[in-house]
């Protein structure tokens, strides 16, 4: 049995601090709009190029177990920030490093760790209140594009594509990032509800050139169980045929005699019909069928509800403006469901998202929500090589996360101004004893940021600090050029491009880390 190494007091804190500094120093080179790229070696394949702090942090594992504990703590800060806000991981790492360093000094000098921690907590509350106070909602597409552009390394193309996607699908819509097959980065927006199930037989195709089933104003039959017996379908088929409309069948499966008869009737021109398997599995399939029923104004045919297929009437069928189906996917456009019921369903799914503790379930619920409101966009990232593709895709994902955070909780002044307001909030808070020392710890990370940010911008620290401290107005995009006339030309060109930052990422920085009391 392997023995355990045990360290106490100063030696333990020093080892942990080495680990904290090792990881943080590797991560913080990526800070800000002029941050550097990091090249990460892989055991197989090409290396990875990234400017994402959490991606760098996740690759670091130190040989010394005590030092590695410090590195893992800071890694957790970056990971937590990434999970909740999606961006701002490098800034969170720099702040964590500074807070730990100062906390260790106070503990080594005989400070009470618990009182110091209470001071930090009270300072955090004041900072969060101030950040929420100065946050403003993002209303215009231009503001969203600014946030996306900044997070994508000042790439305006990416910022504009993300803003366009957000504008088209809304804040509840799903935006996914995929690798393109060409060198161009493009945006594809899917109208209506789309799910990954295609037609059960190619004989249903109405457009042979595109191999698609296109149905205008069809009736939609939603069946929870498998349909194999044709006699169950005959009554509803006869009713639909009399109306001279098409019938789209969505069921667990359609096979055997039922599928064969539908194909024959389609080929003879008796009725325009198509059948597709219902999306999902188990309880998720039932939920999605109910979503489609509400969207189209229909009723799910389920024996659990006492409704049999042979007793279905036209009132039980849903309708929509158009359905397009190929061999892989189906899109329902402009369902005829009741707006009030749809709104109620959306609220119900929102509540389920808030209650769930599973990331997988949350993702699936968000997909359902996006499908219901008809918002699905795909950003196809193009590049010349695989290495460039991965790097660019990472920037797009970062920018998308920052944009979502900005839309969700608003934006705060960028270019370091929000940190100055952070400092003002701390100065206005008066605590006693060692809690005051804990509160002051939170002002130290600002110095780390103001040393690091100008290094990336190649300007003098004190000049930048003085200019930002004098800037109190929230309308930074118009005020910054006025206050930066004495700075170098490089700052004049960069700072106006940093008008806003997502408030959500700022709120997380002070709460992700506090110094241990070892």
From Swiss-Prot:
InterPro entries documented for this protein: Chaperonin_Cpn60_CS, Cpn60/GroEL, Cpn60/GroEL/TCP-1, GroEL-like_apical_dom_sf, GROEL-like_equatorial_sf, TCP-1-like_intermed_sf
| Record's GO cellular component terms | cytoplasm
Q: Which GO terms describe its molecular function?
A: ATP binding; ATP-dependent protein folding chaperone; isomerase activity; unfolded protein binding
Tell me where in or outside the cell this protein is found. Answer: Cytoplasm
Class of this enzyme: isomerase
**Main localization of the protein?**
cytoplasm
Q: Which reaction does it catalyse?
A: ATP + H2O + a folded polypeptide = ADP + phosphate + an unfolded polypeptide
Coiled-coil segments: none
Gene Ontology process terms (BP): protein refolding
Residues that, per the record, bind ATP: 30-33, 51, 87-91, 415
User: PROSITE patterns attached here?
Assistant: CHAPERONINS_CPN60
Keywords assigned: ATP-binding, Chaperone, Cytoplasm, Isomerase, Nucleotide-binding
User: Does the record's keyword annotation contain Chaperone?
Assistant: yes
Matching Gene3D superfamilies: GroEL (3.50.7.10), GroEL-like equatorial domain (1.10.560.10), TCP-1-like chaperonin intermediate domain (3.30.260.10)
Enzyme Commission number, as recorded = 5.6.1.7
Q: How does it assemble?
A: Forms a cylinder of 14 subunits composed of two heptameric rings stacked back-to-back. Interacts with the co-chaperonin GroES.
UniProt lists the family membership as follows: Belongs to the chaperonin (HSP60) family.
Q: What does this protein do?
A: Together with its co-chaperonin GroES, plays an essential role in assisting protein folding. The GroEL-GroES system forms a nano-cage that allows encapsulation of the non-native substrate proteins and provides a physical environment optimized to promote and accelerate protein folding.
Put simply, this protein is called Chaperonin GroEL
State the organism of origin. Desulfotalea psychrophila (strain LSv54 / DSM 12343)
Encoding gene (name): groEL
